[in-house]
Swiss-Prot record:
Residues 73-93, 127-147 are annotated as: Disordered. The keyword Protease does not apply. Phosphorylation at Ser-135 by MAPK8/JNK1 reduces interaction with KIF1A and neuronal dense core vesicles mobility. PANTHER family: SYNAPTOTAGMIN, SYNAPTOTAGMIN-4. Expressed in melanocytes. Expressed in brain. Within brain, expression is highest in hippocampus, with substantial levels also detected in amygdala and thalamus. Belongs to the synaptotagmin family. This is Synaptotagmin-4. It is found in: Cytoplasmic vesicle, Secretory vesicle, Neuronal dense core vesicle membrane. Residues 1-16 are vesicular.
Length: 425
């Protein structure tokens, strides 16, 4: 039989072919991975950024460089100032300070010798390096002044509005307030700060720092809201509340400013604005609303079960819209608070449904010296909450509060529910 011979060259070619295919496979895999990464990165950059809030103090620019050009320093800045057209010194502040919230210019504030200039004045839109006019209708506020509010001077609020399309950011800069009234009668000064809310949702609430002992506070604080589409800006409104901090009691409310953004064009640049501060428009209703409470006294375990069921017809706390109510429950023994509970906050509703149960241990036999206080409050993030209404149930309580208390004492172990009218807190 002839011997079988194999070619060694065939075995030598196999590793070479495998190596070539492996190299091609590796290059293809790396290229595919790089392509997928690039696609993911580009898709992320095109998505609308999630809501994000940035707060900048003391006028630090959130955009250190212009979007289209770098910032110039030194001699270049001087040349820019020289090349800018001369702007009359009073073109901004005279136009805006003399205008009321309806966009009108009262004749009583006109300077002698120049009545026509200010009567025909219009609000100004200031851009980077140029200025253009805006129709007066775009700056009108829906809040009108009464004769009493015009007589009472509460000062002027200065601020600016801007929308950055590249970053999808709405920017509000609270610059200063001038001519605030003195809320401290001893020092004849105030400790002012400002709360700002974006309406109608009321979910964006911010506030400035407190400036001590001044009637002309210069805040210069920038608040930036990311993720608000420009098409939605026209549907919003800004509500500013000017307050004076009080260390020992509730902060004093100086006044408020309401700015509807409908008709205000922010597509061309930053807009400088000011508004007269008006007295807070608290709606005086015939009542403070009603509260549905269920009580049950367990004489065997000496416990009191309190169920906060519903609230209805709660008034608006101010022009910022509906309140965010919650209920605080305080248990008193001989006029001393021994326990406290509170419900969750219900957002933007005058008719809240709570359905929350609390069990209190009674430290004595019977309910003679026991009373329960219910406080309905409007939740305000970052500040002291305002009391909408109050209710007291106990042996010494008048009206339905005393009747409800007598029923649970006469019928222990029975859950008894009643509606109660809230009174001023």
């Amino acid at each position: 039989m002839a011997p079988i011979t194999t070619s060694r060259e065939e075995f030598d070619e196999i590793p070479t072919v495998v190596g070539i295919f492996s190299a091609f496979g590796l290059v293809f895999t790396v290229s595919l991975f790089a392509w997928i990464c690039c696609q993911r990165k580009s898709s992320k950059s095109n998505k609308t950024p999630p809501y994000k809030f940035v707060h900048v103090l003391k006028g630090v620019d959130i955009y250190p460089e212009n979007l289209n050009s770098k910032k110039k320093f030194g001699a270049d800045d001087k040349n820019e100032v020289k090349n800018k057209p001369a702007v009359p010194k009073n073109s901004l502040h005279l136009d805006l300070e003399k205008r009321d919230l309806n966009g009108n210019f009262p004749k009583t504030n006109l300077k002698p010798g120049s009545p026509s200039d200010l009567e025909n004045a219009t609000p100004k839109l200031f851009l980077e390096g140029e200025k253009e006019s805006v129709s007066p209708e775009s700056l009108k506020s829906s809040t009108s002044l009464t004769s009493e509010e015009k007589q009472e001077k509460l000062g002027t609020l200065f601020f600016s509005l801007e929308y950055n399309f590249e970053r999808k950011a709405f920017v509000v800069n609270i610059k200063e307030a001038r001519g605030l009234p003195a809320m401290d009668e001893q020092s004849m000064t105030s400790d002012p700060y400002i709360k700002m809310t974006i309406l109608p949702e009321k979910k964006h609430k911010v506030k400035t720092r407190v400036l001590r002992k001044t009637l002309d506070p210069a805040f210069d604080e920038t608040f930036t809201f990311y993720g608000i589409p420009y098409t939605q800006i026209q549907e919003l409104a800004l509500h500013f509340t000017i307050l004076s901090f009080d260390r020992f009691s509730r902060d004093d409310i100086i006044g408020e400013v309401l700015i509807p953004l409908s008709g205000i064009e922010l597509s061309e640049g930053k807009m400088l604005m000011n508004r007269e501060i008006i007295k807070r428009n608290v709606r005086k209703s015939s009542g403070r609303g009603e509260l549905l409470i269920s009580l049950c006294y367990q004489s065997t375990t000496n416990t009191l079960t309190v169920v906060v069921l519903k609230a209805r017809h709660l008034p608006k706390s101010d022009v910022s819209g509906l309140s965010d109510p919650y209920v605080k429950v305080n248990l008193y023994h001989a006029k001393k608070r021994i326990s406290k509970k509170k419900t969750h906050v219900k957002k933007c509703t005058p008719n809240a449904v709570f359905n929350e149960l609390f069990v209190f241990d009674i430290p004595c036999e019977g309910l003679e010296d026991i009373s329960v206080e219910f406080l309905v409050l409007d939740s305000e993030r970052g500040s002291r909450n305002e009391v909408i209404g109050q209710l007291v149930l106990g042996a010494a309580a008048e009206g339905t509060g005393g009747e409800h208390w007598k029923e649970i004492c006469d019928y222990p172990r029975r859950q008894i529910a009643k509606w109660h009218v809230l009174c001023d807190g």
